[in-house]
Swiss-Prot record:
Species assigned in the record: Erwinia amylovora (Fire blight bacteria)
Record SUPFAM superfamilies: Outer membrane lipoprotein
One Gene Ontology cellular component: cell outer membrane
S-diacylglycerol cysteine lipid sites: 21
UniProtKB keywords: Cell outer membrane, Cell wall, Coiled coil, Lipoprotein, Membrane, Palmitate, Peptidoglycan-anchor, Repeat, Secreted, Signal
Name under which the protein is recorded: Major outer membrane lipoprotein Lpp
PANTHER family (alphabetical): MAJOR OUTER MEMBRANE LIPOPROTEIN LPP (PTHR38763:SF1), MAJOR OUTER MEMBRANE PROLIPOPROTEIN LPP (PTHR38763)
Superkingdom of source: Bacteria
PROSITE patterns according to UniProt: PROKAR_LIPOPROTEIN
GO molecular function, one term: peptidoglycan binding
Role description: A highly abundant outer membrane lipoprotein that controls the distance between the inner and outer membranes. The only protein known to be covalently linked to the peptidoglycan network (PGN). Also non-covalently binds the PGN. The link between the cell outer membrane and PGN contributes to maintenance of the structural and functional integrity of the cell envelope, and maintains the correct distance between the PGN and the outer membrane.
Length: 78
């Protein structure tokens, strides 16, 4: 009975140690993946910021062009 408990305890302890070693490698890999994803998120955030300013400039240009067209249309109607 005691020997069975000792063997069972040794098997559980060995399994835990082996699982712990593989988990460290997986944790390191996941940590690297998270860092990579964080860098990509930062890059995408910068890209979105740049695109927002480009979109605003395009909207402003379109508004000016529409205003010029409206002014020309009013001058033809007179």
């Amino acid at each position: 009975m005691n020997r069975t408990k000792l063997v069972l305890g040794a098997v559980i302890l060995g399994s835990t140690l082996l699982a712990g070693c593989s988990s460290n490698a997986k944790i390191d890999q996941l940590s690297t993946d998270v860092q990579t994803l964080n860098a990509k998120v930062d890059q995408l955030s910068n890209d979105v910021t740049a695109i927002r300013s480009d979109v605003q400039a395009a909207k402003d240009d379109a508004a000016r062009a529409n205003q010029r067209l409206d002014n020309q249309a009013h001058s033809y109607r007179k």
